[in-house]
């Protein structure tokens, strides 16, 4: 995140109080280059204001760290970060403005954040405009779906208009290979729910066609459809659609798609926004 205030002015006004309190003082990010960071560490930044040296204890490094050799960021993202021109030290990019390949938007915490001006930033700006206003979201629904489709977290689709097979296939299209074991666990639970819906038994346990962990999701869907042909024609019930949305929230790791377009869409889309920078698929 970034501030609209001058770091130097904040430090000059509060440095004595902070040091008197004995707290560990760190500053950043957005320091720009090693020389600027070093000036805060040795305190020389304060000399220009006619003060004695005012060293800090540490600096925060964000974007440069993502582009470093050691970072798990994929190479395409590193290259994009390096090639984005950025802005001159001491200048600002106003909220919604695009300059130097950068824009200032709002994070899922509704705090100001600098972003590369790409499809993700455009989507973020649109979602910030509609907020949690259900009428505004409904009025711009098609625009939102299109914006989501250009990001790493597209809209899953209208679940109640899908067959059970299509729902399972769409999940695999958007989430496999699993980036986290909980994504695969959700799929296993979804398979179990679908099989329970399609089997003849109306209560109690039933003999499952799956006798162990699902290692090949595409093969599992074929096996399910062969055992229960209705999977190809029966549309998802409202109860199962609600189960699906609840399932996406069940584990800490968010799913790599937006399951439903509602008043919580901004949070659903923005949760865990940096994970895709590690995966070349995105």
Give the role of each language-model region.
Residues 1-3, 7, 11-22, 41-282:
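Conserved active-site-proximal phosphate/metal-binding subdomains
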Residues 23-40:
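Glycine-rich beta-to-alpha transition loops that act as phosphate-gripper elements at the mouths
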């Amino acid at each position: 995140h970034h501030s609209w205030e001058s770091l130097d002015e904040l430090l000059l006004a509060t440095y004595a109080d902070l040091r008197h309190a004995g707290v560990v003082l760190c500053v950043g990010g957005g320091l720009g280059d090693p020389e600027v960071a070093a000036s805060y560490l040795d305190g020389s930044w304060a000399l220009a204001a006619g003060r004695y040296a005012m060293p800090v204890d540490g600096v925060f490094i964000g974007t440069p760290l993502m582009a470093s050799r050691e970072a798990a960021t994929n190479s395409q993202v590193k290259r994009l970060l390096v090639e984005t021109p950025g802005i001159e030290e001491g200048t600002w990019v106003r909220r919604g403005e695009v300059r130097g390949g950068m824009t200032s938007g709002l994070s899922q915490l509704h705090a100001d954040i600098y972003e590369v001006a790409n499809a993700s930033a455009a989507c973020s700006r649109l979602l910030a405009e509609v907020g949690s206003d259900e009428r505004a979201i409904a009025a711009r629904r098609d625009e939102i779906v299109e914006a989501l489709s250009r990001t790493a977290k597209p809209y899953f689709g209208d679940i109640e208009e899908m067959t059970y097979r299509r729902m399972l296939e769409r999940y695999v299209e958007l989430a496999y290979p699993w980036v986290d074991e909980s994504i695969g666990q959700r799929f296993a639970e979804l398979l179990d729910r679908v099989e329970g819906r399609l089997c003849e038994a109306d209560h109690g346990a039933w003999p499952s066609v799956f006798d162990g962990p699902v290692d090949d999701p595409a093969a599992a869907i074929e096996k399910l459809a062969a055992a229960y042909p209705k999977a190809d024609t029966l549309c998802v019930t409202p109860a199962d659609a609600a189960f699906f949305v609840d399932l996406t929230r069940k584990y800490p790791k968010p799913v790599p798609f937006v399951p439903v377009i509602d008043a919580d869409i901004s949070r659903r889309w923005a949760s865990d926004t940096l994970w895709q920078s590690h995966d070349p698929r995105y």
